[in-house]
């Protein structure tokens, strides 16, 4: 019984991470980013490390996701993502920051 409960607990913990990866894929984030390697943009783990310990990091990153930016990660700018609403941007930012 303990093994079954443990397996359910682990599986339940993975569902939000998979849902957030699905959201990132649906919103085309994964065209330029990967979790653990640089593509066109930085890896999400690098983004999480850069924002680690910053006050209001999720809010700052959510704005960056929606409005884009340039000059932080090199010469290629991140375009604005008009297909991402505020709630989705906050969810994506929280997910990215959770990656270690």
Residue spans of the language-model regions?
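Classic N-terminal secretory signal peptides
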Residues: 1-18
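Short hydrophobic/aromatic patches at helix-to-coil boundaries
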Residues: 22, 96-100
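Axial heme c-ligation environment in periplasmic c-type cytochrome domains
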Residues: 31, 40-51, 64-93
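Sequence/structural segment immediately N-terminal to covalent heme-attachment motifs in c-type
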Residues: 18-35
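A general structural signal marking secondary-structure boundaries and capping sites
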Residues: 36, 55, 68-72, 99-100
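Short microdomains enriched in Cys/His and/or Lys/Arg
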Residues: 50-60
